[in-house]
């Protein structure tokens, strides 16, 4: 296996950009080298003020990370707080940040929204 690949975290947003889904995630795929920052965006359905972020590690099930309601973090019990942070500003998309990515951050990240 190429050793350069081992220094990267691959972050996938499955289902991103599907017009029928209503929720838009971008970028669809993101590759970062170890130590770089990853920034994932989620634009909820129109009229929705709640956003939920989930992560699915390889060979594992979907796990809750954080629940936000416009500018407020309601529940972040599933989010590793050392390098991860999330926000949902009054205007604009919700953003999930991963600082100084490591190989173990390679996963599929999903967001969902509700009214």
Swiss-Prot record:
Residues 1-21 form the signal peptide. Keywords: Adaptive immunity, Cell membrane, Disulfide bond, Immunity, Immunoglobulin domain, Membrane, Receptor, Signal, T cell receptor. The keyword Membrane applies. It is found in: Cell membrane. InterPro entries: Ig-like_dom (IPR007110), Ig-like_dom_sf (IPR036179), Ig-like_fold (IPR013783), Ig_V-set (IPR013106), TCR_beta_variable (IPR050413). Its main location: membrane. Disulfide bonds join 42-111. Residues 22-115 form the Ig-like domain. GO terms for cellular component: plasma membrane; T cell receptor complex. One of its GO terms (biological process) is adaptive immune response. Alpha-beta TR is a heterodimer composed of an alpha and beta chain; disulfide-linked. The alpha-beta TR is associated with the transmembrane signaling CD3 coreceptor proteins to form the TR-CD3 (TcR or TCR). The assembly of alpha-beta TR heterodimers with CD3 occurs in the endoplasmic reticulum where a single alpha-beta TR heterodimer associates with one CD3D-CD3E heterodimer, one CD3G-CD3E heterodimer and one CD247 homodimer forming a stable octameric structure. CD3D-CD3E and CD3G-CD3E heterodimers preferentially associate with TR alpha and TR beta chains, respectively. V region of the variable domain of T cell receptor (TR) beta chain that participates in the antigen recognition. Alpha-beta T cell receptors are antigen specific receptors which are essential to the immune response and are present on the cell surface of T lymphocytes. Recognize peptide-major histocompatibility (MH) (pMH) complexes that are displayed by antigen presenting cells (APC), a prerequisite for efficient T cell adaptive immunity against pathogens. This is T cell receptor beta variable 18. It comes from Homo sapiens (Human). The lineage of its organism: Eukaryota, Metazoa, Chordata, Craniata, Vertebrata.
């Amino acid at each position: 296996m190429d050793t350069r690949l081992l220094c990267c975290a691959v972050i996938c947003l499955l289902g991103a950009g599907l017009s029928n889904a209503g929720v838009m995630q971008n970028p669809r795929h993101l590759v970062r080298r170890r130590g770089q920052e990853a920034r994932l965006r989620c634009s909820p359905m129109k009229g929705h003020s709640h956003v939920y972020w989930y992560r699915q590690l390889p060979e594992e099930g979907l796990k809750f990370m954080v629940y936000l309601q416009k500018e407020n973090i309601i529940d972040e019990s599933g989010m590793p707080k050392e390098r991860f942070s999330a926000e949902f500003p009054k205007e604009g998309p919700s953003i999930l940040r991963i600082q100084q990515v490591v190989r173990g951050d390679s996963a599929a990240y999903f967001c969902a929204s509700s009214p």
